[in-house]
């Protein structure tokens, strides 16, 4: 099993948690981005740089993810593709995407896209907080505990 990160928009605090987890568990951690990313020297951590472009990193993750792998992303369509392939998806804020909730999340995303296209401003996500950092760390620990079994 591996942990894949949609790394271009992933908060640094989450990356730090993931670096520690990769070292602690010896689980492969792959950060996929269209720019260079600094990572600690480790045999468990690597980067995969892709070309710039719409969904290029997402498509590369979907192509490589295996059943049981975890993907860290806030991209709902990417999460849906990962779940379809038998993987798990978690946001950097600690929310888990599941077979039970992904369709509803896609519907809400599509609705919000329609609202934005019609000129209604919806705002963006709130700044990343310490509470969300803890929620992510706890959700990651739950996944790692399940993966050990």
Curated annotation (Swiss-Prot):
Disulfide bonds: none annotated. NCBIfam families: PRK00124.1. Coiled coil: none annotated. This is UPF0178 protein Tola_2809. Belongs to the UPF0178 family. Signal peptide: none annotated. Pfam families: DUF188 (PF02639). It comes from Tolumonas auensis (strain DSM 9187 / NBRC 110442 / TA 4). It comes from the Bacteria.
């Amino acid at each position: 099993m591996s942990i894949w990160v949609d790394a271009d928009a992933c908060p640094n605090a989450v990356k730090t948690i993931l670096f520690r987890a990769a070292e602690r568990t010896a689980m492969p951690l792959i950060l996929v981005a269209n720019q260079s990313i600094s990572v600690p020297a480790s045999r468990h951590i690597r980067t995969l740089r892709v070309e710039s472009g719409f969904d290029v990193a997402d498509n590369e993750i979907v192509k490589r993810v295996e059943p049981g792998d975890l993907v860290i992303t806030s991209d709902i369509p990417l999460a849906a593709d990962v779940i379809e392939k038998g993987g798990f998806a978690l946001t950097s804020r600690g929310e888990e995407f599941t077979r039970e909730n992904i369709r509803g999340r896609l519907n809400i995303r599509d609705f919000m896209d329609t609202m934005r296209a019609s000129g209604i401003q919806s705002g963006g996500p709130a700044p990343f907080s310490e509470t969300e950092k803890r929620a992510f760390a706890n959700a990651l620990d739950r996944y790692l505990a399940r993966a050990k079994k």
